[in-house]
Amino acid sequence: MTTSQLAKKGEAWSARFSEPMSDLVKRYTASVFFDKRLALFDIQGSLAHAAMLAKQGIIAEADRAEIERGMAQIKGEIEAGGFEWKLDLEDVHLNIEARLTALVGDAGKRLHTGRSRNDQVATDIRLWLRSEIDNIIALLGALRGSLLDLADQNADTILPGFTHLQVAQPVTFGHHLLAYVEMFTRDAERMADCRKRVNRLPLGAAALAGTSYPIDREFVAQQLGFDGVCRNSLDAVSDRDFAIEFCAAAALVMTHVSRFSEELVLWMSPRVGFIDIADRFCTGSSIMPQKKNPDVPELARGKTGRVNGHLIGLLTLMKGQPLAYNKDNQEDKEPLFDTVDTVVDTLRIFADMVPGITVKPEAMRAAALQGYATATDLADYLVKKGLPFRDAHEAVAHAVRACDSRNCDLADLTVAELREVSGLGDKSALIGDDVHTVLTLEGSVAARNHIGGTAPDQVRAAIAAARAAL
């Protein structure tokens, strides 16, 4: 950064001051090197504002035409990477305005009539975030599609379901994956709901009180595709609820990714061995030649903490601000930008990684055969024979304890042995010769044949419904 560039910073407002800003303060307060990513949205908002000014007779049509010509050139320079961003011009808005004025003269100076950078930046952020939300919703759809494909391939694959990381009941792997489809579906719904509050136009609020020019805010809103305008000028320039709400929705997206990541890491570990992840998503060790590390899901877990931190940062940023705009709000952009980048990159890579997962059904089945996964089925069997559930629960617990001492599974006990160890006494005859049909893994999952259940038929129906909803 040259000394001459630094010396010029503040030209848009420096006439009020008796001494120049220090170089350190210039660097401390500038935002151009991160808010320049709003540039194309800044141009979009400015063109709509210029169209409104001309329509209302506030500027001449000739000025509007010059503004459009200049903005077209600036847009081309930015897209080609040839635009010169200057720290001395502080932010994205003044950089573009200065270049516009250099290109079209006084017409460029008239563009800022009836607006402030306060409502300008609020508009830019909303335009940018709206676009990013649309992208995130599409990426959530792609990830759900990948999960549905894998679930469809494994509608009959049985693995143990866990509570407290202890074997609980057998479920199908397809059913397990559908749980994440549900989570990411809710995430998409939250993003769409958040978008409604993002999609309001603050432009026209000016610095904080509105403007004395005869502007038409509804026209600008229509031009930019907003659903309506912010109804209070003070709130319009100071509101960052929409950014906080988005970050909360994004934190939930990452939380769901993190839960899935934890399972992927667990499933891939040699001690479990339920799946393998394609090599292109893993790394090795610089010292241990045998290692294949699931770095992508591990990093996703870690990045979730960063996104959660951005949410807390924005809440803290806003908690002590009086109305209306304060410079604190400049600090909203970097956490918001990083949240979007992290979520977008994560969803893209996971949508690509899921199809590369190799499932190991034999290992899943072997694990499901341990830990008495069908114990609840035996209790249900006794209830259907007329035994109260609590008595059935106790009887099966006795049987499990006997299996522990004999180092066997419930299905390994004969009918006579089950009757003996159940503690049911004269009611032990309720355990009939058909008891082993409920102690199979296939029988257990097939019995859960209702909406939301793990039966393969229900899993396939749920997959079809989820695909139709994409």
Curated annotation (Swiss-Prot):
Top EC class of this enzyme: lyase
Pathway(s) this gene product operates in, as recorded in its UniProt entry: Amino-acid biosynthesis; L-arginine biosynthesis; L-arginine from L-ornithine and carbamoyl phosphate: step 3/3
InterPro entries: Arg_succ_lyase_C, Argininosuccinate_lyase, Fumarase/histidase_N, Fumarate_lyase_CS, Fumarate_lyase_fam, Fumarate_lyase_N, L-Aspartase-like
GO CC terms of this entry: cytosol
Claim: Nucleotide-binding is one of the keywords in the record: no
Keyword presence, Acetylation: no
Main location as per UniProt: cytoplasm
Enzyme Commission number(s) of this protein: 4.3.2.1
Gene Ontology MF term list: argininosuccinate lyase activity
One Pfam entry name: Lyase_1
GO BP terms, alphabetized: arginine biosynthetic process via ornithine; L-arginine biosynthetic process
Keywords from the named record: Amino-acid biosynthesis, Arginine biosynthesis, Cytoplasm, Lyase
Subcellular location: Cytoplasm
Catalytic activity: 2-(N(omega)-L-arginino)succinate = fumarate + L-arginine
Similarity comment: Belongs to the lyase 1 family. Argininosuccinate lyase subfamily.
PANTHER family: ARGININOSUCCINATE LYASE
UniProt protein name: Argininosuccinate lyase
Organism: Cupriavidus pinatubonensis (strain JMP 134 / LMG 1197)
